[in-house]
Amino acid sequence: MVELNLDAGNVISGDVHRVGILALGSHLENHGPALPIDTDAKIASYVALEASLRTGAKFLGVIYGATEFPYVKHGIHIERDELLEGDLKPVLRKARKRLNIDAAVIVNGHGGNQLEDCVEDLMDELDMEIIWNNRIVEIEGPHAGSGEVSAGIILGIADLTRLGECRPELYPEIGMIGLREAREANKGIDRAARICEKEGINPDPVLGQRILDDAIESVISDVRELLEMLP
């Protein structure tokens, strides 16, 4: 068998090849008129790939499916167990087998909002270390709001000519302002909607870059943490 040069290139450690980074974000979710329906997948993929490039960890791509709480009705999602059994587990098993991955960071860009509590069981079943990175969700703010549009500017996926159409009466998913069931079921969603109602959408490339950089650095930190955990 060929001996691989694991320390070659700009990598933080030869062992970093044992760590994978997997993106998880919805491809089929309305984000108002200024952002595409696969915004979550693109943001999560960008963050995951950039962290991979800066550390040398393996980029494992993006999961095709996404799950969401049943009261959030702004896109097409699948059941949590279907995503877990049909998408997430097979990808991680194949990465473990084909790439000798012993650990992974899952970058959640709103594609796995019901999966975080499954991580411990997932680690036991797959016999690998996993960190669930939720930084994008934590910092980008209301759905299809200023934060996401600002990040979209940096990625080149935002259409600023349509900002004038960003009205919740036309696109109820903006800030989830018009998603009454979701607002009634989840105080956090209602709080974010109230912020968006009050402040509107104010795109800012500086904010967008800051959000992306923060998320990338968070994933890099997780990669370093996993390296310390590996035998």
UniProtKB/Swiss-Prot annotation:
GO-annotated molecular function: 2-amino-5-formylamino-6-(5-phosphoribosylamino)pyrimidin-4(3H)-one formate-lyase activity; ferrous iron binding
Keyword Iron: yes
Reactions that this protein is recorded to catalyse: 2-amino-5-formylamino-6-(5-phospho-D-ribosylamino)pyrimidin-4(3H)-one + H2O = 2,5-diamino-6-(1-D-ribosylamino)pyrimidin-4(3H)-one 5'-phosphate + formate + H(+)
Cofactor dependence: Fe(2+); Zn(2+)
Role summary: Catalyzes the hydrolysis of the formamide of 2-amino-5-formylamino-6-ribosylamino-4(3H)-pyrimidinone 5'-monophosphate (FAPy) to form 2,5-diamino-6-ribosylamino-4(3H)-pyrimidinone 5'-phosphate (APy).
PANTHER family from the UniProt entry: 2-AMINO-5-FORMYLAMINO-6-RIBOSYLAMINOPYRIMIDIN-4(3H)-ONE 5'-MONOPHOSPHATE DEFORMYLASE (PTHR35005:SF1), 3-DEHYDRO-SCYLLO-INOSOSE HYDROLASE (PTHR35005)
Protein name: 2-amino-5-formylamino-6-ribosylaminopyrimidin-4(3H)-one 5'-monophosphate deformylase
